[in-house]
Regions:
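Short, gly/Ser/Thr-rich active-site loops of penicillin-recognizing serine hydrolases
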Residues: 276-292
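Active-site helix/loop module of the DD-peptidase/beta-lactamase fold
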Residues: 64-97, 146-182, 186
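Short, charged, amphipathic alpha-helices and their helix-cap/turn boundaries
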Residues: 21-27, 32, 101-130, 150-168
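Active-site SXXK
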Residues: 45-70, 94, 140-144, 194
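Conserved catalytic neighborhood of penicillin-recognizing serine enzymes
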Residues: 81-107, 119-121, 125-129, 133-138, ...
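Active-site-proximal alpha-helical segments within enzyme catalytic domains
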Residues: 136-143, 182-203, 254-269
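A short, well-structured edge-of-sheet supersecondary motif
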Residues: 2-41, 254-265
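Active-site Gly/Thr loop motif
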Residues: 167-169, 212-266, 271-274
């Protein structure tokens, strides 16, 4: 039995024991893969995993010379009103949640203002402080759209279609831009392809879709996010942990978990059980590595 199948079976057992509300599971270790379904593989919002997809969009644009991560984001939206300190905020700050701009989450965040990005940038920055917000990713993609046009169309051509992911329909804000920090419906199998691209440092079937350095930056040299394990470091959309692993983590249990040559994809409807499940997955991967 392959390592991927062993890990899959142990995760399935852990889900059964814990009662975690899993929908789908895909395990890739080396060239081996295995999957399991609890529910049909239908389109589901991957929530904040979409932030990682937005990082890939910005990375591809940077590879093409269309945008820079390290110049003030106001260069790309010069007509936007800006708060105190905002002229120092870069695309990298927005995508690492370290802009220092405070805009509290609400259920109606995307519709509370005519243009969320304008509202975000007109507020003051407190310097390089971690402040997790969908508005931060949305503002980054607003800046990107000023250089590449519609970000959804840009991703279709350069990421989704090369991965064999067709007919992607983002949830849109009232002004027509993708919601960016969420609102991306994918199947488990499609999310797993994005996970494999990331695991393989930007390569897909012999073609490099995004430079490896950007993939590394998704989980290396992150900013201090807080005191709690698993939420203490945040890089370009990637959370450090559990353990030696790192992950893209969407609400309600949408997970891409990376450890060495393994990537585990989980879709679910279980917000509060996700942290424990992520830790269990990493423990299972580490045990399998030891041959136990």
């Amino acid at each position: 039995m392959t390592a991927a199948r062993i890990v899959r079976d142990r995760i399935v057992e852990a889900v059964s024991t814990s009662g975690f509300g899993a929908h789908g599971l895909h395990v890739r270790i080396g060239a081996g893969e295995a999957e399991h379904r609890w529910t049909p593989d239908v389109l589901e919002d991957v929530h904040s995993v979409a932030k990682g997809v937005c990082v890939l969009a910005a990375a591809i644009a940077a590879d093409e010379g269309a945008i820079s991560f390290d110049v003030p984001v106001t260069v790309y939206v010069p007509d936007f009103e800006r708060g105190e300190g905002v002229d120092e905020v870069t695309l990298r700050h927005l995508l690492t949640m370290s802009s220092g701009i405070d805009l509290p989450w609400s259920e109606t965040l995307m519709t509370d203002w005519p243009d969320l990005a304008r509202e975000f940038l007109r507020r003051p920055s407190r310097g390089r402080r971690f402040q997790y917000s969908n508005a931060s990713t949305y503002t980054a993609m607003t800046a990107l759209s000023a250089r590449v046009g519609d970000v959804g169309d840009y991703l279709d051509a350069r990421l989704f279609r090369p991965l064999g992911i067709d007919d992607v329909v983002w949830t849109r804000s009232p002004n027509g831009r993708i919601q960016a920090g969420g609102g991306l419906p994918l199947r488990t199998s499609e999310m797993a392809r994005i996970g494999l691209l990331i695991r393989d440092r930007g390569w897909w079937q012999g073609t490099q879709l995004v430079s490896s350095g950007w993939i590394d930056a998704m989980h290396e040299n992150g900013v201090v996010a807080g005191p709690n394990p698993g939420y203490d470091r945040y890089a370009l959309a990637g959370w450090g942990g559990p353990g030696r692993g790192w992950r893209l983590h969407g609400a309600h249990g949408q997970l891409l978990i990376f450890l060495d040559d393994a990537v585990v994809t989980i879709t679910a409807a279980d917000h509060f059980g996700a942290d424990e499940m992520a830790a269990t997955v990493v423990d299972i991967l580490e045990t399998a590595r030891r041959g136990a």
